[in-house]
Amino acid sequence: MNPSELRMMWMSSQYNSERITLEDAATLLGHPTVGLSVMEDLSAHQPTLDMNPMMSLMGGDFTGQAAATAAALGVQPGTLIATNSNNLYGFAHMGGLQQQLLQQSAAAAVFQNYAEAMDNDVENGMVGMAMEAVVDDDDQVYGQRDNNFDDNGSELEPKQEIINIDDFVMMNEDNNSYDGTDFMTSSDKDISQSSSSCMAQMPGSLGVPGVEHDLLVPLPDGLLHHKLLGTTLVPAMGTLNGNAFGNIMVSTENTSSKQMQRTYSTAKGANSTATTATCSASTSSALRSQRKTRKIEPVNRPGLVLKTPIAYRGNIDPSVIPIQKDGMAVCKRCGAIGVKHTFYTKSRRFCSMACARGELYSLVLNTKMEGDQATTSSPDPGAGSESADLPGDQQQSQSDIELDLHAAHIKNANYRFRITDQSKITQLNSFGEPMSMGGDAAANNVQMAADETIAALNGGAVGDATAPGSTEEGASTPNSYLSAAPTPKALRLFKDIYPQDDLPQIPKYERLPVPCPQMEKIISIRRRMYDPTHSYDWLPRLSKENFNAAPVTCFPHAPGCEVWDNLGVGMKVEVENTDCDSIEVIQPGQTPTSFWVATILEIKGYKALMSYEGFDTDSHDFWVNLCNAEVHSVGWCATRGKPLIPPRTIEHKYKDWKDFLVGRLSGARTLPSNFYNKINDSLQSRFRLGLNLECVDKDRISQVRLATVTKIVGKRLFLRYFDSDDGFWCHEDSPIIHPVGWATTVGHNLAAPQDYLERMLAGREAMIEVHEDDATIELFKMNFTFDEYYSDGKTNSFVEGMKLEAVDPLNLSSICPATVMAVLKFGYMMIRIDSYQPDASGSDWFCYHEKSPCIFPAGFCSVNNISVTPPNGYDSRTFTWEGYLRDTGAVAAGQHLFHRIIPDHGFEVGMSLECADLMDPRLVCVATVARVVGRLLKVHFDGWTDEYDQWLDCESADIYPVGWCVLVNHKLEGPPRVAHQQAPKPAPKPKIQRKRKPKKGAAGGKTPTDNNTQSVKSRTIALKTTPHLPKLSIKLELKPEHHNAAFYENNQPEEEGDEEDPDADGDGDGSTSHISEQSTTQSSSDLIAGSGSGSGSASLVTLATGSNKTNSSATNNKYIPRLADIDSSEPHLELVPDTWNVYDVSQFLRVNDCTAHCDTFSRNKIDGKRLLQLTKDDIMPLLGMKVGPALKISDLIAQLKCKVNPGRARSHKTNKSPFL
């Protein structure tokens, strides 16, 4: 603050008219400001001058600065008197100029106390000795810094708790720096001042008036921190020493400790009256000097209070904080809430470097305390250092914090101090609390504490230093000496930087998003030799001219959507060089060693067409997923020491490749440096395994059911119901999942355990008790807020009985008339599709929100030329809304009730994408946009008829860009291979067609259908269901599972393989299923029940054949029996399991209800011979130590052996023993 600013403040402010003189300045101001250029001119006492108005202004600005400044200059200032206004303005101006020196000198004074001061005479019991100093000719020990040296108000910058010298250096570099500690409010300051001042007056207190005790005094309720309160009785010390800086350690050569003690004792009686008078004066002066911080608290919402410039206070309701839930973080140290990417340390857990330091010091100190306890309980004195090792989680946390501290302060390394000599620790003011032990024990404890301090300040493991003079008695002293015994000042400084009690955390901290348990790195996948998922490969279609993929920016939920606009054609990247001498075998998680520069020629979804620099033709162009570990920005190799190796084909084309690259890269664009960080961050799920939530019951869609998250793949969750192993897949943004307590809140039917229901019922009258594994509302995506219905008093606009059109939740390819059956709270309502027969129990009702994009006004289909499915009993050719409303006497919902805002989504007809089949949600299939109606998309599954199409919203979380499955390691189902009718081949390869979609029967049930009803071939097909489909009268469950023919063909002898159908669709691949060709037709009476598939969301039907019925299958003329249904009357077929290949073994497991383990046996290449050799001990590790499945398969193998050798059947039955 310069003189002109001070003058303007003085002229415009309304100052206190109370008359004071500058003899009282010490009482009012604490420490007057010292100007550097006028120190020598102020040695003589000047006449007092009444400058009350201006001093009132200055009182809050420069308090507490003279002490440290004087210490830095090496002089003992006298009382400063402003004789005129020019001096006063000079003091104000110089006070601002000396801020930098003030900060450095205060730090130097603190650390010199440890390096230069000599040991107190503890044995003489000098209790209450406040300030002692012994100096030599070269060095001078300066007074203890005031812990709150600017508490009395400096408006130049906010109060900061100084932790180490780095803080001073950081503040020196930037006066606006802020370490993240709490601002002390005026009430806090008054309490601390009055408490510490009056403590010197208490009869039983230690020391004399005006002496700083540095007691750890707990603040009253409502204050979260313990402050190290220094006594502020500056006037008493000022009177004692004859100047206004009594709390400075006076440099007195040849003065012993005992002499100083006698000096203080003599002055004690003479100054007791003055101390009593100044106790209240100091408190009142604090009220007049309440300072303000420069950070202005927001006024637009009074409930939001900043704790630091980047974080709000921790006691604020997170729902009112204007931060996205997925970007919110809570400081692990102090509970402050802020934006996650602005927090400190690599794991983003602290709101400031001060909190990070405090956590580090707490870890060190707490570990030392635990080590001390182990030491005192152990007879071996040397056991203490052994027990001081940090646990694994604390070591990880400590190293994380230390790394950030080092990175933040690396430029200030020269300012660090290191205490290496134990003898240089001086116990200044060493009696923090009354002693409760003898002098010898006290000395031992002080020595032990000093040793701990040395180890802690040196950054080593606390507890490594051992006091040379420690005795056995001292070693066995309880570790309560930290608070009940003399404590060296070094250790009390250590205690100042961490709170004594755990700070309260907001309840929702435990429920903030937890990283998804998936690989941190995007693994190398470009040249994987074996793909365990057998996913469909887009590569054959990418190069076609008419292929059009939907851009990644069309999918707001897709990984990297927010940064995809930064990518473009013509960018240069560094990519793996596959045209080299030695072809590497890249394993998952490994990084290739050879790279070269390439140019992006075309981008389709996540796929990019690239060309190596140096090629003039497209002969070596290649497609690669932009989000894998083999593509990097230009310069990545240089930072990691990897060479750029030109392709072998053109390695001799240029003599100087360096000049060539310089010319090509000049002015070129490359990937953003944080591109892959953004991709990885967007791949993390908001949910974690084990969370409980409420989701739609797929067996009764009119109710929700408690379920648990058991798997997470690419933000897709597998939910398992609480009372069964059944469940289904859905995306975390799906509207059919809800937070805990949702059903109770909106009035929806709920199926859950009894204790859960009781907890929800109790929450109706009060807040719902939240458990650790409850998925709360901030994890869910909603297109509305509950505040809309609270703040505006909004109610539902829909009325029970209204008619509208809606997407059929049981058949997403149709839009039907529907009726509002019930109106719930917060915009939710239950509707019934009128195309079905009414159900008296209401089990066919489904919950939609009034803002759902899947409901439409009456007549929407006719306006947009969409075929509407008529109500039950009406003909689609004659159905009209006018006649229907007239017949039912109902009212159509008005157009204004529907929210049909159409965003610029970017989808066009013909765009390819990947889409989840919501009739079987575990499958993600190749699909194409068949139609766009506003924001409504009709998605067609490639290779399937239109009856499998799905109407989805443009922002649906069930559609993904091309290449998404590769990115998240999810299987992609390709189009089916169409086998044309022709003469049978000698040894036809079995194939399975993808499941068929059911058609509605007359009673609303489902019956399987097949497009090729004239074919004599039998097929294994799937009954397409929905996660909300009620149980059918005929229970149909999964029997065979989709598998890859290409893999099995690669493991068969060449003579057993068959040629590919030349007329098959070239776009297909091994992700399609197989068709078992047999000689007889199938009928509906051949339906059988099998076992669950694991996901429980799809049901498959096996259509059996002729004499074999369902007991076996024929594959390449090999008999594979179903052992569970063996009938003695069945004609005997030749059974030779020794000749089975890998596929035959998988087929054997399928027909015997062990489909879930087919892939495991296939990956291990188990053929018929090896299958017969497997023992129980072999099967257990093969199946991941799962006892039940291993026991079942072991028994199947035993039955198979008995089937081959009937003579062993009797011995098998009689000698059957337990598995374990």
Swiss-Prot record:
The keyword Zinc-finger applies. GO terms for molecular function: chromatin binding; DNA binding; methylated histone binding; zinc ion binding. Residues 473-482, 1071-1082 have a biased composition (Polar residues). It holds the Pfam family SAM_1. Keywords: Chromatin regulator, DNA-binding, Metal-binding, Nucleus, Repeat, Repressor, Transcription, Transcription regulation, Zinc, Zinc-finger. Residues 991-1000 have a biased composition (Basic residues). Its main location: nucleus. InterPro entries: Mbt (IPR004092), MBT_dSfmbt_rpt1 (IPR047358), MBT_dSfmbt_rpt2 (IPR047359), MBT_dSfmbt_rpt3 (IPR047360), PcG_chromatin_remod_factors (IPR050548), SAM (IPR001660), SAM/pointed_sf (IPR013761), Sfmbt_SAM (IPR037605). Residues 371-399, 464-483, 976-1024, 1050-1092 are annotated as: Disordered. Zn(2+) binds at residues 331, 334, 351, 355. Residues 1052-1068 have a biased composition (Acidic residues). GO terms for cellular component: nucleus; PcG protein complex. One of its GO terms (biological process) is imaginal disc growth. Polycomb group (PcG) protein that binds to the Polycomb response elements (PREs) found in the regulatory regions of many genes. PcG proteins act by forming multiprotein complexes, which are required to maintain the transcriptionally repressive state of homeotic genes throughout development. PcG proteins are not required to initiate repression, but to maintain it during later stages of development. They probably act via the methylation of histones, rendering chromatin heritably changed in its expressibility. This is Polycomb protein Sfmbt. It comes from Drosophila melanogaster (Fruit fly).
